[in-house]
Amino acid sequence: MANLTTRKIVTFIPSGNQEGEFETAVQFYQEIGFTINAHTDEFAVFTKDESKFFLQKYPKEWIQGNLMMVLEVENLDDWWTMLTSLELERKYKGVKLTAPQIYPWGVREAHLVDVCGVFWHIS
C-alpha cells in the first residue's frame, strides 16, 4: 500500500524585487518574531516555533493582495499586544492591522497586511 502521508506545506512569499523591498521584508518579519534560518541576497527561510515560510526576492505585483496566510497562535491577545506595540503601521508602508474579532466563520482572529501585501489571518 502506498504511503501518501504529508509532512507539511511551506509557502514562498515574494518580497518584491525593487531596491530595498527584500531587505525591508526581512527586517519586518524579524521584528514580528520570526527567526532567519537561512539567508542569501535573494532568499530567506523564516521560522517561529513549528511555523515556516520562505521569502524570495521576486516581483510581488502579480500576487500582492491575493495571497493569504493563516497563523494559528496560542494566545491571540498576547500577539495583538505585541503587534500594536511595534507601531508597524507607522514604520512600514502598506502595513495594516485589524483588531481581533469573531468572524462569521466562527473564528476569533486579527488581521495583518504585511509589507509584501500578504493578508495574514492570526487566530
Which residues does each predicted region cover?
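N-terminal beta-strand motif that seeds the catalytic metal site of vicinal oxygen chelate
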Residues: 1-24, 69
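Conserved active-site tyrosine of GNAT-family acetyltransferases
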Residues: 25-29, 114-117
